[in-house]
Structure formats: structure tokens, C-alpha cells
């Protein structure tokens, strides 16, 4: 996986819409009529199940090619994929979440180097490469995360006597972010807030923001420095002080006492931010839907990178994907061809583009979506970051973390540290040494 993501991803899609869970099909996994082949897509995203099924029907009505869509229940995709791939009529299109997922299914991934979906990518460095350098996965959802900020609260702060900045545009490094957050925390009564940052909750609905997304930042810089592009057997003790500094900022300049973080949820943090109780909130482009529903206006929020003091001057937002299309190399040539034609139609036809960008609310990396406008202010900021030639987007290297258990152990160590029941050395141990433990267990 290429370390840089400088090329513009293009104008991206609207915020995701939640829909009821469904798992349904239509058509057969057989070769189809007239040698056209057929398509069987095992979908990973339950929230988009209905939309995929409707889109499959549209394609069948238009082309006569049978398309079956089946959606795995949340948290069961790997298990269901294993079961379905063992059947005679196996999925022709399936998904992996990145390099670790690829290792599980690399015996089934066709070469997509010459495919239209790969050729239509704005930034081909985002594609997933196999062990031999071939393209084995094409991302169809691109997302960005960082520190979301309330423009109104920041503006109110800059108007105070002695404010350390005159504009949010001056927050371009960790040192400035810390000075602003520390000062806001001291003057929270003047600002009408409860803390500079929303609660860093470690309930399961929120802990991924820290054990995965925040931990990704020091991991990214380590992998960038050592030119690591595939999951390593071990990692080094690098940038741990930087990791500690940003986490300390989150839990010190906060709306919530450290002793209460274990029970704080993702909804708590979202609500605190939407109600103006905090100026800063670590999350991503997907958060806009909930914030908008809570009454926030598009012109009142923005997003900046998670600065940790390594290469702040050139750091962009954390941009990547956990959703890669793969074509099953074990099915017939006719079905492989039919599957690639279906995906080409999905990203190029008006019906397909509308389904992805509006109905499913996906942010897409294809040139065919460059004319798609968005009213999501966080995606607008992501576009600016991606299109800024002076910035390098932070890769989603957490996709190379060896296991879910690795993340859980790290998260527990971070919570213990935050609550005062553990020390930072335990976090370093969970981050560095447990990587090798979990990698060895998986291999």
C-alpha cells in the first residue's frame, strides 16, 4: 500500500443514511443465460443492503444479467464469506478490509490491474496490492477523520482578551492545538463550554476512536519512516511520547472527569459537541449526519488533522478505506467478466452513481464522481486536504493491526492509564510487544 495519498479523490458523496438490516438476493449464481454470466455480491455493509438489492434489480432489468446480493449481519462477514466461498455457487464479488483481510482470502482474489474500476480511480495508490504487486482490491468507499471543531466556539474564543490565536486557521501543529485547548479549558466558563474536548469514552461505541483511529497516527509515522507497506511481524517503540501527548490532551482538557471515561459512549461525545459543550471532537466525515440531525449547521463545523508533533506542517487528514471490492478468481471467466461489467456500471451509470452517492451516502474514489457535489462540510474539508499538494494524507495503517484482540488490549491499557489504574508503560507494551504476540498467533 502506497504511503502517500496526494492525488485528489474528487468531489465526494453525501453523509451515510441508516437503513434497516436486510439480506436478500435475486437471481442465480450460475453461469446465466446466453453465456452472459451472472453476479453474486456478498455485501459487507448492512446499512446499505436495501440499496444494493434495488440496484441489482435495476441492472438485471436493464441488461438481463442476473445479480444476486446477499448481506452479512453485522460482525459476521468473515464467517459468512468462508461459508459461501465453499459452496458451488460462490460469491463472484466479495470484500476485504485491507492487507490483513487480504491475507485470509488471497487465494481467491483475481488480478484487477486491467479492470475499469481500477483505471477509474482518482488516486490509484489507494488500491490494495497483493503479495506479487498486482492490484487485488479496489476501494469503493473513502473516508477521512481528524479533529472536528466548532467554528462558533473557536470564534468566541479568539475574541477573548489574551487568546493565543486570532483564527482557527492558525491551528496547524500540535503545540498550537495544545495552547488553545489548555486556554479554553481554563476559560470554559467564559466560553459557556464544559471542556475543550468531548469525552474520550471507552464504551464499545466509542473506544475505536482511540484504540484504532488515534493509535493509527503514530503507527502511520513509524510505517512511513521504515517504508512498511505490508503487515509486519513486529513494530518498534517509536513516537510513543507523541501518542501520549495527544491522548493526555484529550483526557485532560475534557468535558468529563477521567474516572468516568469507561462508561462514556459515542453518543455522549456526539451530543456534547452538537450541544456546544465542547469545541473539539475526534471523528470523521461520517459524523455529519448525526450532527446535522442534532441541529448543527454546515457552516458551524470544520475538521483539522490530528496533530501529534511529528510532521505537522505537511500532515493532512487521515484518509483511507476498509471496503475493497475483490473478484473471486475461482468462479468461471464468464462470471468474473459479468461481475466486472456490473461494477463498471455501478460507478459510471447515472443510476449507479445516484445509488452510491445519494442512496448509500458513500464517499467514492472514482473519476466518474468528480462532478458529484456534497453538502457535507466535513467532506468538503476532506476534499481541500486531499487536493492540497503540500499535504500528505495519513494512511489508514490500522488496517494492518494483527487482530481485533490487539486493539482490545491496547484500548484497555489506554483506559487504565486514563483512569489512573495503569501507567503509560503498559500502553507502550500493549502497542509494541502485543503486536508480535497477536501476529504470531495469527500466523
Regions found by a protein language model. Name each.
Residues 353, 364-366, 370-374, 388-443:
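Conserved C-terminal helix/tail region of periplasmic/extracytoplasmic solute-binding proteins
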Residues 113-127, 166-170, 201-204, 219-245, ...:
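Short, solvent-exposed loop/beta-turn-alpha elements that line the ligand-binding surface or hinge
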Residues 4-14, 21-101, 117-119, 310-312, ...:
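Conserved N-terminal structural module of periplasmic/extracytoplasmic solute-binding proteins
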Residues 97-155, 209, 302-305, 375:
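Hinge/lid segment of periplasmic solute-binding proteins
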Residues 179-182, 226-263:
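Glycine-centered hinge/linker elements that transmit conformational signals in sensory
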Residues 136-140, 145, 175-231, 278:
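Extracytoplasmic/periplasmic solute-binding protein
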Residues 66, 255, 294-361:
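Extracytoplasmic/periplasmic substrate-recognition and gating elements
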Residues 71-80, 172-176, 260-275:
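Short helix-initiation/N-cap motifs at beta->coil->alpha
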Amino acid at each position: 500500500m502506497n504511503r502517500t495519498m496526494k492525488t485528489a479523490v474528487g468531489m465526494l458523496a453525501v453523509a451515510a443514511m441508516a437503513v434497516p438490516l436486510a439480506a436478500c438476493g435475486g437471481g442465480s449464481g450460475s453461469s446465466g443465460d446466453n453465456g452472459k454470466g451472472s453476479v453474486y455480491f456478498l455485501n459487507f455493509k448492512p446499512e446499505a443492503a436495501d440499496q444494493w438489492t434495488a440496484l441489482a434489480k435495476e441492472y438485471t432489468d436493464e441488461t438481463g444479467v442476473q445479480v444476486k446480493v446477499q448481506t452479512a449481519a453485522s460482525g459476521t462477514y468473515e464467517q459468512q464469506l468462508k461459508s459461501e466461498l465453499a459452496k458451488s455457487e460462490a460469491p463472484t464479488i466479495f470484500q476485504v478490509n485491507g492487507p490483513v483481510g487480504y491475507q485470509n482470502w488471497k487465494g481467491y482474489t483475481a488480478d484487477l490491474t486491467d479492470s475499469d474500476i481500477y483505471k477509474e480511480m482518482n488516486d490509484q495508490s489507494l488500491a490494495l496490492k497483493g503479495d506479487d504487486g498486482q492490484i487485488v482490491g479496489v476501494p469503493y468507499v473513502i473516508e477521512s477523520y481528524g479533529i472536528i471543531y466548532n467554528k462558533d466556539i473557536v470564534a468566541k474564543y479568539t475574541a477573548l482578551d489574551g487568546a493565543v490565536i486570532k483564527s482557527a486557521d492558525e491551528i496547524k501543529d500540535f503545540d498550537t492545538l495544545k495552547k488553545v485547548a489548555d486556554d479554553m479549558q481554563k476559560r470554559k466558563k467564559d466560553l459557556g463550554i464544559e471542556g475543550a474536548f468531548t469525552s474520550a469514552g471507552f464504551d464499545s461505541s466509542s473506544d475505536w476512536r482511540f484504540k484504532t483511529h488515534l493509535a493509527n497516527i503514530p503507527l502511520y509515522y513509524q510505517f512511513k519512516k521504515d517504508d512498511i507497506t505490508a503487515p509486519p511481524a513486529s513494530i518498534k517503540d517509536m513516537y510513543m511520547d507523541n501518542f501520549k501527548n495527544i491522548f493526555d490532551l484529550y483526557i485532560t482538557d475534557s468535558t468529563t472527569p477521567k474516572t468516568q471515561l469507561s462508561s462514556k459512549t459515542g453518543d455522549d461525545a456526539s451530543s456534547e459537541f452538537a450541544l456546544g459543550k465542547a469545541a473539539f471532537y475526534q471523528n470523521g466525515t461520517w459524523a455529519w449526519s448525526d450532527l446535522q440531525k442534532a441541529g448543527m449547521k454546515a457552516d458551524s463545523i470544520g475538521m483539522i488533522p490530528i496533530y501529534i508533533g511529528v510532521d505537522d506542517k505537511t500532515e493532512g487528514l487521515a484518509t483511507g478505506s476498509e471496503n475493497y471490492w475483490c473478484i473471486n478468481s475461482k468462479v468461471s471467466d464468464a462470471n468474473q467478466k459479468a461481475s466486472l461489467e456490473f461494477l463498471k456500471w455501478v460507478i459510471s451509470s447515472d443510476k449507479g452513481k445516484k445509488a452510491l452517492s445519494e442512496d448509500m451516502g458513500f464517499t467514492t474514489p472514482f473519476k466518474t464522481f468528480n462532478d458529484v457535489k456534497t453538502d457535507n462540510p466535513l467532506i468538503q474539508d476532506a476534499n481541500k486536504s486531499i487536493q492540497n499538494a503540500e499535504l500528505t494524507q495519513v494512511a489508514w495503517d490500522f488496517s494492518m493491526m494483527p487482530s481485533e484482540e490487539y486493539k482490545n488490549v491496547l484500548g484497555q491499557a489506554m483506559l487504565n492509564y486514563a483512569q489512573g489504574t495503569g501507567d503509560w508503560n503498559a500502553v507502550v507494551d500493549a502497542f509494541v510487544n502485543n503486536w508480535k504476540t497477536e501476529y504470531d498467533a495469527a500466523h
